[in-house]
Each structure stands twice: as C-alpha cells, then as structure tokens.
C-alpha cells in the first residue's frame, strides 16, 4: 500500500496541478504511477462537462467558451504533456538522422518549429471547440481518460528507444501485469462510456483516437526506433486533437448530406 500511495502522489504531482506532496522519483515509488494518470483525465473530462452546463449562463460568446475548453485540459494537467509534444515536433521537423532526432529530444530548449506548431495547434483546437455540437461534449469528455490509458499501455508494452527513461515507469512481473490490466480496464470503460452516451459521436471519436495511435506507432518506430516519454506525451496531445477533429468533420459531413437531400 505504501508504494501505491507514493505512486498516487507522484501521478498527481507530475500530471496535474492538484497539490500533492513531492516525494523522490524512484523506480519503487513510480511502479504504479501509470494507474492514476487516467484518473487525472477523468477529472478533466468531468470539469469540462460541467463547463458545458454552466457556460451558457456565464458568457454570451462561443469563442471565449471555446478558448476555455482548449485551455482547461492544459491548465488542469499542468501542461504535463506539452513539453514532450514540443520536443517531438522539433525533432520531427528537423528531418535529421535518428541519432540527431534523439539528441533534440534531450534538448530542453524549444525551437521555432515547436513554437509555430504550438500556435497552430491552439488555433485549431479553439476552432474545433467553437464549432463542436453540444451533444458531442459528453463523449469527448471520456477521451481524456482514453488518451491517457493508451499512453500508459504503450509505455508498459512498447519497446523503448535506447535514450528512453520510460523504464522508470515499468515494473516487473506482477506489478507490470497489474498496471496493464488497469490500462485495459480504463480503455474498456471509456469506450463503453462513449458508446452509451451517443454511438454516432462515439464511433468517429474512436476513429480519431485510433488514427492518432497508429500515427504514434509510426513516429515512434520509424523515426526514433522505439518510444520515449516525450514521444508518448506527443501522442496524448495528438490524440486529444484528433478526436474532436474527426467528430466535427463527421458532423459537418452529416449536415451536408441532410442539406443535399433537402
């Protein structure tokens, strides 16, 4: 239980803004940390859903509401995944050999490629939320659990690059099996929750998550020879923009079909 409690505190101190007393990052203390990362996603999804309920009474402009929707996940997670996203974008944009890309991942400075992509990312996510149908919000709220569960599962199951520090997250024997079982359970819960909310929204949302995961696999193994923590963080940000993107594109296509029939 002591190790579980230590992992819980580390998960919330590293992956959220919620206060948790800092403890030493050792392999023993981090053995179960991935179990609690999707719980942060559940809190983000819940708060986002509550924002959907109260925002019409607080603001009149959809744009401001969309900006808040885009910023809430970043704010509540403490920007935990953005750093890895920046570094991976920098490495991919360099078009250098694998060894140089891995070196860029270790660089703590952000290049102009990362800054440009970041600005484009936030413009796109704000635009998506500003046009998102209200009935899609409950489904997308589950997406914050799904993205983090896939993040955890990949760290446990995928081969790591030689430069990766992900081994700190990976236990051995029984503890590793427990973490994998929890990740699979989170994935099942989020998928079932999406389908129960609205199957017509859930399917494109899951397609978006699948596309992001396949792209993640391609980037990790083709460009870097395995995953690193930064590349896994890159996946979370890509997944959380692909899900609303595919949902919105599907909604637009459906409206165009209906308009064409009329």
PLM feature spans:
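Membrane-proximal soluble regions of multi-pass membrane proteins
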Residues: 1-25
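Alpha-helical membrane-inserting segments
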Residues: 20, 43, 47-55, 72, ...
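Interfacial loop-to-transmembrane junctions
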Residues: 29, 218-242
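Multi-pass membrane catalytic core of lipid/isoprenoid biosynthesis enzymes
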Residues: 31-48, 91-135, 139-140, 177-194, ...
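C-terminal ends of transmembrane helices
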Residues: 20-24, 80, 100, 104, ...
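Alpha-helical transmembrane segments and their lipid-water interface positions
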Residues: 17, 81, 90, 118, ...
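Membrane-embedded alpha-helical segments that form the functional core of polytopic membrane enzymes
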Residues: 34-89, 138-142, 201-222
């Amino acid at each position: 239980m002591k190790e579980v409690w230590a992992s819980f505190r580390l998960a919330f101190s590293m992956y959220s803004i919620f206060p948790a007393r800092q403890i030493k990052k050792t392999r023993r203390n981090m053995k179960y940390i991935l179990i609690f990362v999707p719980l942060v996603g559940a809190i983000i999804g819940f708060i986002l859903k509550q924002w959907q309920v109260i925002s019409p009474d607080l603001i009149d402009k959809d744009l401001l509401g969309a900006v808040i929707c885009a910023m809430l996940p970043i704010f509540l997670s403490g920007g935990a995944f953005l750093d890895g996203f920046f570094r991976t974008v920098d490495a991919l944009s360099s078009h250098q050999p694998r060894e140089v890309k891995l070196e860029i991942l270790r660089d703590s400075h952000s290049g102009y490629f990362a800054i440009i992509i970041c600005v484009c990312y936030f413009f796109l996510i704000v635009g998506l939320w500003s046009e998102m149908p209200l009935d899609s919000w409950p489904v997308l709220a589950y997406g914050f659990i799904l993205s983090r569960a896939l993040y955890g599962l990949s760290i446990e199951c995928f081969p790591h690059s030689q430069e990766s520090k992900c081994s700190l997250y990976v236990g051995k024997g029984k503890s590793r099996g427990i973490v994998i079982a929890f990740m699979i359970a989170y994935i099942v819960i989020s998928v079932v929750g999406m389908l129960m909310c609205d199957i017509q929204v859930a399917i494109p949302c899951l397609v978006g998550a699948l596309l992001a995961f396949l792209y993640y696999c391609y980037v990790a193994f083709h460009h870097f020879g395995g995953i690193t923590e930064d590349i896994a963080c890159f996946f979370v940000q890509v997944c959380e923009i692909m899900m609303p993107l595919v949902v919105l594109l599907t909604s637009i296509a459906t409206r165009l079909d209906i308009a064409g029939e009329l």
